[in-house]
């Protein structure tokens, strides 16, 4: 019984370590959770971020416009 319990504990610890490693990789993945949007006076497409007050850092956004409680961010 003790060996089986110890084996379960080892497997559980290994699962936690691998899950934490996957979360660290996912944090740095270049994945945007934005949809397409257009602002008045802009010809190209922007990224619509839902229920955000400002554009997120790290995507190179330079201009923006507000669409209700959402924000449309434009790179470069």
From Swiss-Prot:
Keywords for this protein: Cleavage on pair of basic residues, Disulfide bond, Hypotensive agent, Ion channel impairing toxin, Nematocyst, Neurotoxin, Potassium channel impairing toxin, Secreted, Signal, Toxin, Voltage-gated potassium channel impairing toxin
Protein name as annotated: Kappa-actitoxin-Avd4m
Disulphide bridges, residue numbers: 37-72, 39-65, 55-73
InterPro entries: BDS_K_chnl_tox, Myo_ane_neurotoxin_sf
First and last residue of the signal peptide: 1-19
Tissue-level expression: Weakly expressed in the ectodermal tissue from the distal and proximal tentacles, body wall, and oral disk.
Gene3D superfamilies hit by this protein: Anthopleurin-A
Cell compartments where the protein resides: Secreted; Nematocyst
Any single GO CC term annotated in Swiss-Prot or TrEMBL for this entry: extracellular region
Function: Blocks Kv3 voltage-gated potassium channels. Reduces blood pressure.
GO MF term (any one): toxin activity
Family: Belongs to the sea anemone type 3 (BDS) potassium channel toxin family.
Maturation-removed propeptide residues: 20-31
One biological process term in Gene Ontology: regulation of blood pressure
